[in-house]
């Protein structure tokens, strides 16, 4: 049985809000959110780490490219644990790369580098870690998407309401680049 905590972000969270306190979370029992066709589970966020990093998983179906975006202050890690994920990156000099990551593969995206990804197999899963001086962005997922109590993928993709696209990303160091073109394929 999981313990629930009230935090400033959620009325019921599986993560204790007190920084500096050890805790344990069973598989899948973090703070869950649906965004697009994905299930995001946050295990540690800014509240626990004094805004030094976050730790989350993203599980999704084979599908569309997550839109190109950039973080001005946040470095991001992609570590694939299940399936396959294609990671697209563009460095600050404009050089583009893409790589198919399979279980055990790792990708690092420094701040200010445009990136996107696509799940290449059903039920692919990525462990994400993000860190930066301005705080962490784990609450982005539930604010652009929606918190959920479900353990699985959404039955229908959760497409954000249009008004959220203008306010939510900027609060969490996410800038979408809708006109960005990937020249790698």
Residue ranges and their predicted role:
Residues 1-53, 155, 159-185:
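A short, N-terminal "cap"/entry segment at the start of jelly-roll beta-barrel domains
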Residues 44-46, 67-72, 89, 97-99, ...:
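Short histidine-centered beta-strand/loop micro-motifs
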Residues 48, 52, 91-111:
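Short acidic-glycine-tyrosine-enriched beta hairpin
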Residues 64, 85-86, 91-95, 175:
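Hydrophobic small-molecule pocket/channel-lining residues, especially in calycin-type beta-barrels
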Residues 65-67, 86, 97, 105-116:
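Histidine-centered metal-chelating micro-motifs
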Residues 73-86, 90:
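Glycine- and acidic-residue-biased ligand/ion/polar-headgroup-sensing regions
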Residues 103, 111-138:
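Ligand-binding loop in jelly-roll beta-barrel domains
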Residues 138-155:
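A hydrophobic, small-residue-rich beta->alpha segment in the mid-to-C-terminal subdomain
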């Amino acid at each position: 049985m999981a313990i629930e905590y009230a935090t400033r972000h959620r009325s019921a969270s599986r993560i204790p809000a007190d920084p500096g306190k050890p805790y344990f979370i069973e598989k899948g029992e973090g703070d869950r959110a649906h965004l697009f066709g994905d299930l995001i589970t946050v295990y540690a966020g800014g509240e626990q780490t004094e805004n030094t990093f976050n730790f989350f998983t993203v599980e999704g179906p084979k599908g569309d490219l997550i839109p190109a975006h950039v973080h001005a202050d946040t470095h991001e890690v992609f570590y694939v644990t299940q399936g396959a994920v294609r990671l697209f990156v563009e460095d600050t000099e404009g050089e583009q790369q893409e790589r198919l990551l399979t279980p055990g593969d790792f990708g690092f995206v420094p701040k200010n580098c445009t990136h996107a990804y696509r799940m290449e197999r059903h039920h692919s899963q990525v462990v994400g870690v993000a860190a930066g001086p301005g705080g962490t962005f784990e609450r982005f997922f539930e604010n652009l998407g929606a918190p959920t109590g479900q353990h699985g993928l959404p039955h229908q993709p959760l497409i954000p309401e249009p008004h959220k696209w203008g306010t939510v990303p900027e609060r969490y160091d996410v800038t979408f680049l809708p006109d960005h073109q990937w020249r790698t394929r």
